[in-house]
Amino acid sequence: MRSIGFYSVLALYVGAHVTEDVDINFSLIGATGATYKTFIRNLRTKLTVGTPRVYDIPVLRNAAAGLARFQLVTLTNYNGESVTVALDVVNVYVVAYRAGNTAYFLADASTEANNVLFAGINHVRLPYGGNYDGLETAAGRISRENIELGFSEISSAIGNMFRHNPGTSVPRAFIVIIQTVSEAARFKYIEQRVSENVGTKFKPDPAFLSLQNAWGSLSEQIQIAQTRGGEFARPVELRTVSNTPTFVTNVNSPVVKGIALLLYFRVNVGTDNVFAMSLSTY
């Protein structure tokens, strides 16, 4: 496996025209690192149509209602099995998925999600929520740092969700899909790491995991920095690939340039008060 440094970023953002009335689709059949990147970039584009940018980073919507609150993503594995995953457009959370004539909703999915998504088929409420702590517990008390990622693991996750195998396989599948779809949409580094593992597997490194944990704080401080000449009100602690602490203190950091989506925060002009307009991150 080729090692990628923590500060590796993809400088080039390629936007693609995405029709607003269709799902985003990704099939592993014939997939390459390039087609995976195109899928992730199309998803980012769809999630941020008409939204502002802060330091040239697209900001997610601060609110949405009804079906507009959710983006559907259809994933197909190497065996041709497909599931359709529903993402919350405000924070890129996975809230539910459909396999055949059954839709499965995470325990913390909203009533609105249950009311508007996957109408006309059987709905099942899962006994665990969509945050990492709950999923890791349901997956057999395994930390996501010990769960391998890569195209083969995405394929297996889709298959387990499609068949909804009992036990720990589905919550483990959620952990794989969340990191390779939602987290990859948020961070170019995560997108890059996944795209490199078409025929191989890898376990998330400390940098990979610390970015996931700090997305909310990074989004907050980047938006506060607009009122502070680019400086953060509080440093954000991350980890390098070798697990050394490192701190991000302003928008000139290469870490900031590697962020692809920001969670929306409303900043009180003239103060450092910030009001989160969505749920906390995974």
UniProtKB/Swiss-Prot annotation:
It holds the Pfam family RIP. Its EC number is 3.2.2.22. One of its GO terms (biological process) is negative regulation of translation. Keywords: Glycoprotein, Hydrolase, Plant defense, Protein synthesis inhibitor, Signal, Toxin. InterPro entries: Ribosome-inact_prot_sf, Ribosome_inactivat_1/2, Ribosome_inactivat_prot, Ribosome_inactivat_prot_CS, Ribosome_inactivat_prot_sub1, Ribosome_inactivat_prot_sub2. It catalyses: Endohydrolysis of the N-glycosidic bond at one specific adenosine on the 28S rRNA. It is an enzyme of class 3 (hydrolase). Residues 1-21 form the signal peptide. The active site is at residue 183. Belongs to the ribosome-inactivating protein family. Type 1 RIP subfamily. This is Ribosome-inactivating protein bryodin II. It comes from Bryonia dioica (Red bryony).
